Amino acid sequence: MKPSLIFSQYVWLVNTLRRYGRMTLEEINDKWQDDEVADGNPLSRSTFNRHRDAVLDMFGVIIECDTQDGYRYYIDNPEVLDDDTLERWMLNSLTVGAVLADSQSIHDRILLENVPAGEEHLQTLIQAIKTSHKVEICYARFGHSGYNIYVAPYALKLWHQRWYLLSSNGKYLITYSLDRMRSVKVLDQTFKLPEGFSAEAYFSEFYGVLTDNEVPLKHIRVRAYGQTPNYMRTLPFHSSQKEVETTDNYSDFTFDIRPTYDFLNALSSGGPDLEILEPKELRKEMKDWLQSSLDKYKDE
């Protein structure tokens, strides 16, 4: 069996249990045989058990059997597939990959976003992170020639279709974009991750990958108009986002965040449909920023 089909079967099993909830093996098999993923074969108990083990290894998803409820199978830890988890991202990626693989006949009608280079360094960096080895990177900032850096790789983050490496040079934590890396070499020298370090906690007070601890943490209130509240509900700007007021004309959201350039840029992209209400100094900063942009059009 082709590896791509096997992965599709793993994804199918997880998504089926997520969609339909508790199911007996017979019920799962009925759904299985109605789908192309079955490849014309019924789902035997041995195949189901192998896939069940593989799903645990690959996604960390535990499929349990409730012997008190007619031997129905269910996902025992659905929280592992919550937003912003590696397991959720892997499942979504494989799900999309499986769907696209079955859609070659209409490939010219499925348009994908261009993704910058850099993925070729992922495997090397992941290996270095797993084994706690430092790396040598030939890095080229925009408009500059390449230069070598020697860092301890702490974590990887995917943001707006770009991969970033959070690393330490021994004094500071620095984030590098993988698409600006010309080469990556794993060194023999090892490093020790600081006790209690959490990449999620490190980025938790910021929007995106640009971090600056000199920017104070602020409680921010934003008013959204039109359809923007719906977009913010379905895809929150930040984990601290809360909807605190809802009316027919607008909705107010609050954030507890350090408002760096990335966050202000994201708010400004909302145009007239996003307005900073508080704090007043941040409202003025945004006003000055927008005025600066408007000044560029004064000659028209």
Positions of the model-derived regions?
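A residue-level signal for conserved active-site and pocket-lining positions in enzyme catalytic cores
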Residues: 13, 48, 132, 222, ...
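General beta-strand recognition
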Residues: 72, 136, 164-166, 252, ...
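Short aromatic/basic micro-patch
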Residues: 22, 150, 175, 254, ...
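A structural signal for short hydrophobic beta-strand segments in well-ordered beta-sheet cores
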Residues: 63, 156, 184, 243-244
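Bulky hydrophobic/aromatic content
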Residues: 11, 25, 53, 60, ...
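Short, basic/aromatic recognition patches that contact phosphate-bearing ligands
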Residues: 1-85, 292-300
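Polybasic (Lys/Arg-rich)
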Residues: 204-300
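Core beta-strand-centered patch of the WYL/Sm-like small regulatory domain
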Residues: 109-221
